[in-house]
């Protein structure tokens, strides 16, 4: 069925200044969707986490078009994950010479794209099965 092994193109964002749980809320909405559908969802999403994820999806698509010469209409998100990063530690000055520690969470986001055109294009059921498996 396959012409060759379908390569995975990825974009990795590290040390993004937000909680991993807040980023996962957005990532769960786009996992397994096509590239164009993902852009529409992220542009209309009201969360602060949507913007850095949108930049990563753009970056992964430009990586795919540069390395594989693939069309953006054939791309879909095969894997999207969010991992915790190191906490940025600061001290906030308080009254009477005291200070309180502030821990600002960070996260690492990975977006993997696959190109559907690497599979047989004559059977549309293969493409639909790929999209269903990725979800």
From Swiss-Prot:
Protein name as annotated: Large ribosomal subunit protein uL22c
Organism: Cuscuta reflexa
One Pfam family of this chain: Ribosomal_L22
InterPro entries recorded: Ribosomal_uL22, Ribosomal_uL22_bac/chlpt-type, Ribosomal_uL22_bac/org-type, Ribosomal_uL22_CS, Ribosomal_uL22_sf
CC annotations in GO: large ribosomal subunit; plastid
Gene, per the UniProt record: rpl22
Recorded family membership: Belongs to the universal ribosomal protein uL22 family.
HAMAP family per record: Ribosomal_uL22_B (MF_01331_B)
Entry function: This protein binds specifically to 23S rRNA. The globular domain of the protein is located near the polypeptide exit tunnel on the outside of the subunit, while an extended beta-hairpin is found that lines the wall of the exit tunnel in the center of the 70S ribosome.
Location in or out of the cell: Plastid
Assigned keywords, A-Z: Plastid, Ribonucleoprotein, Ribosomal protein, RNA-binding, rRNA-binding
